[in-house]
């Protein structure tokens, strides 16, 4: 497992109608990146903040799925929240303490204006290589895709570690590895498959099973 993490979970909120949002738990991955399943709730809500009832339903299903496969609950969970985590930390702390589970919460922000250049190659207008990152305290800008020189600067991901015991270096490494194992393409993805699949589930919400854990990747 990556850094003794047992389970990775992706969360996203999609808009199906004006003002109507559906949260989804993209994926329950084990610590080696193998898919356990995904869960799409049918609970509609207003705004980007996931309702606590929906959160509890999602995480209950994830824990059951993990235990069904591994015969025990995960000891350490990492949550990747697409965009901003508007839910606040308190609910997560109470929920996972109640279940005796360590957790880390990481925001994966993809729509940012920042661009990166390799400091030793600026004069040649060269782009940084895939896997390079700039780290500032609990934040990191990560280049997760390979872009050819002179074709425009790649858009990094902004990773924000909101809670937990992992180092930001460990989080960067995990996100990069999870961006390399997308089974739906021969190319690597810009996003880790946690939030990549969550985003796809939201966009195809009408075509995936609701309120039941599934491992059928219809949305790919």
Listing of model-derived features with the role each one plays in the protein:
Residues 1-220:
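Long, contiguous domain-sized segments
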């Amino acid at each position: 497992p990556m850094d003794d993490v047992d389970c990775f979970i992706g969360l996203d909120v999609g808009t199906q109608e004006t003002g109507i949002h559906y949260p989804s738990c993209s994926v329950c991955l084990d610590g080696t990146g193998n898919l356990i399943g995904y869960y799409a709730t049918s609970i509609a809500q207003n705004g980007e903040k996931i309702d606590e009832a929906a959160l509890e339903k999602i995480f209950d299903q994830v824990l059951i799925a993990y235990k069904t496969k591994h015969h025990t609950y995960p000891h350490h969970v990492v949550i990747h929240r697409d965009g901003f985590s508007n839910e606040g930390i308190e609910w997560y702390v109470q929920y996972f303490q109640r279940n005796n589970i360590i957790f880390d919460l990481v925001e994966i922000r993809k729509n940012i204006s920042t661009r990166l250049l390799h400091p030793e190659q600026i004069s040649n207008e060269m782009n940084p290589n895939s896997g390079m990152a700039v780290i500032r305290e609990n934040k990191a800008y990560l280049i997760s895709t390979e872009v050819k020189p002179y074709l425009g600067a790649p858009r990094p991901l902004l990773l924000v570690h909101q809670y937990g015991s992992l180092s930001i270096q460990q989080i960067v490494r995990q996100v990069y590895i999870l961006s390399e194992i997308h089974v739906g393409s021969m190319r690597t993805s810009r996003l880790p498959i946690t939030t990549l699949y969550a985003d796809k589930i939201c966009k195809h919400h009408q075509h995936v099973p609701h309120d039941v854990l599934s491992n059928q990747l219809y949305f790919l």
